[in-house]
Structures are given as C-alpha cells and as structure tokens.
Amino acid sequence: MSLAHTTVLLWAWGSLQAFEIVEKESVFQRTPCPAFLVFDNAAYLADMSFELPCHCKPEDVSAVVWYYQKHLGSKRTTVLTDFDGRLLTEAAHVRVGSSMLVRFSIRMFSLLVFRAQPEDTGLYFCGTREGDYFYAYDVDIQSNKEIVASFKDMAQEPLPDEYYGALHVFTTFWEWTPCDRCGVRGEQWRFGLCYLQYPDLSPRYIKTRSAVVSCGSGAVPWKLHLQTKYHTPELQFQSCLVSCQKRNKTRKGVLAIYSYVSKLGSRPWVPQVPIQFHQQRLGHGLIISCPGARPEHAVAWDKDNQPLYRAQYLKGVNRSMRVFIDHGNHLHIRFTQLSDRGIYYCWLQGLKIAGFRLGVITRGRYPASLSDPETRTAIELTLMGYLLITIFFITIHLCRCCCQSRCCPNFSAQTLL
C-alpha cells in the first residue's frame, strides 16, 4: 500500500474517532431537560446494585450533584457527592447493611448505589451544588425477606393478580438468568417485583405503562399501601441444560513437572478451579460466598460431585434445614457436623470458578463474638428461657395470692410474711 493510501486511511480513522467523541459529548445537548420536574419510576430488589443516569443537564455545567429525599417535600435532604462529581467507590469494599453514604459512587454524571436496601427508597435528584435540579428518579427498593419462590418443574404458579375495585396489583418479572451450570442439569431463575395499576396516580411520576408504577412508588396514595403490602416479590425457578464452552486446558509442561514430582510417573490431583482451605469448629455456623457474585447473578453450589439444587436447598423450602442457600446466593451451614467436610464448588453464570475445601475440627479455641449468628442465637434462647421462668414464677405467686385472698379474706400482711 502506498504512502498516500496510508495517509488517507489514517485521516479517515481520525475523523471517525473525532465524530464519535462529538457524538458522546452532545448527548446532553440532544436531551432537553423537562420544564416541569417529573420523577422517573424505577424498582429494584434489595441487595441489588443500580445506576441512575443524569439524562439531561445544561451545557455549561461540568459537574453534577446528587440529592436524596425520603418523601417529596421533605425538609431533610441528603447530599450524595463530593461536590466535584467524581466520587468513586469500589463495589467490592461495600458491606451489607452499611449506610448509603458509603454505598454510592458517581461516574460520568451517573449515580451508582451498591447493595441497595429498602431504606434507600425515595427520590433522587440530579442537579448543581446551588440546588438547581435537572432530572429526578422515584426509586423503589423492595425487601427480599418475605420473597415467595415457585418452581415451574413442580407445576407451581406465581402469585395471582389482585383486584380491589379500580386497583390492580400484579407481579412484573425480569428476564431469565443464564443457566447456572453447564454439562449437567442446572437451574435458572427470574425475580418479579410488585407493580400496581390505578387511574388516580400523581401526574408528576413517569409510568412504565399507562397508570402503572411499582408498589413502593411515591405516586401511590397512602390508602393503597395496605392492599399492596402483602403482595411480596417473587422468585421463579426452572430446570435447564446447556453444553460447556471449551476452556484452556493445563499446559503439557506443567503436567510434566507434576509427573516428575510424583516420582512414580502418575500425575497428582490438579484442581480445575482455585481452591481455598478453611477449618471450622464442630457445632458452629459458616456462611460461604461465591467470589464476584451479586444477588442478580446465576450462582450454583455443589458439594464434591453432588449438586445442591435450590428445589431442595433454597431458604424457606424447609424450616428445619441446616444447610441452605439464601436469596443472596450465599451457602449457609448451621451447626457444622463432621459429615459437612468436603469441597464446595461455586458456579457463576454457568462456569465453575472456585472451590472451598472445608475441614471440621472438634477441638481448639474459638473466641465467642456477638457478630457470630450462632452466638447471638444461643444468647437469645438463654434470655428467652430466663424470661419464661420468671413469668412462670410470678404467675404461680399471683395465683397463690388470689387463692388466699378468696379463702381467707381476713388474713393480715404479717401472716403472709
């Protein structure tokens, strides 16, 4: 290719890049801000992370400030920014239950909230440090504590729609997740959130459909909350089977080294995924998390070669379960037993990514801590036992006093003493 052709191609490539940059910078110019501030309704499940883009802003504004209000017209407004519009927070460093002030991040004018909680429900405003608002969201974070699970393979149906006159309460499902395993039978699921349809909703809230908003939206009148509080979020599961993609095998040189070290020419056991070792004291609880997994991901667990399907191990399927998977994809083992020893494998989005080798010891010091759920349970049961004994003791003495006052109405206080 000649020098002239090369020059023309480079010039064309540079022009395309310049055009791309101009297009990205002109997004806010092509999106006019509403003359009357309205709220864009959005609903999420608890423990999920979500992003709120600032869809419009004046051209001369170089940094945005995000504000939060619990209710419209509230006198308390929380500022979610460092006033430079560039606050960054890593999702991996966010702990469950921490304050929203340490669970948000601002990237390219968008607000990111990690591990959202029902307390984060409210109104979010995109504006300037002077308090001028450009765009607003009505965010509804629905709790996952009373979530209802159904399994299509067992012919279980989701919750039926509810009608209260002009009010229509129903569930809107998200897309199915990918199959959580490959090469063997797996499971996929989707979650549904509570929505309602009502003709007399506030016009300041943008609806997904005509007169339809999430059940926790600020557009819902207070008198309707009693009808919607029992329509909880849902989880629906079904079986799936997909083939595994080809993955890079262990290099021959590494296998040759293993063969040399074994001395007998037989290769030692080579784990397919990284394995973490942990020893747990007998009788104490343990919670295992899948690395890099979030509640909306497809996560599966195996013990050695035995799959732990949610149809048998999902939290709430059986109240007496000692080993179960919660709605955040964590594996719980309560009151560890010797039979729990083994390797627990974690699948993420259909790929086996990690293993957890669990050993159970019967001796050794184990410092008690209030952060340990088993310790808290033991303390609660002990206090409850003392409370019941105290109530029983007081009840017996009250009965004795009542009986003596009826049988011997002329007894004196000295007689009782």
From Swiss-Prot:
Cytoplasmic side of membrane: 399-417
InterPro entries xrefs: FAM187A/B, Ig-like_dom, Ig-like_dom_sf, Ig-like_fold, Ig_V-set
Chain positions carrying an annotated carbohydrate: 248, 318
PROSITE patterns, sorted: IG_LIKE
Gene3D superfamilies: Immunoglobulins (2.60.40.10)
Cystine pairs: 290-346
Main subcellular location of this protein, as a coarse class: membrane
Domain Ig-like V-type: 268-362
First and last residue of the signal peptide: 1-18
Membrane topology listed for this record: Single-pass type I membrane protein
Extracellular domain ranges by topology: 19-377
Transmembrane parts of this sequence: 378-398
Localization per Swiss-Prot or TrEMBL: Membrane
GO (cellular component) term, any one: membrane
UniProt keyword annotations, A-Z: Disulfide bond, Glycoprotein, Immunoglobulin domain, Membrane, Signal, Transmembrane, Transmembrane helix
Similarity annotation: Belongs to the FAM187 family.
Name used for this protein in its record: Ig-like V-type domain-containing protein FAM187A
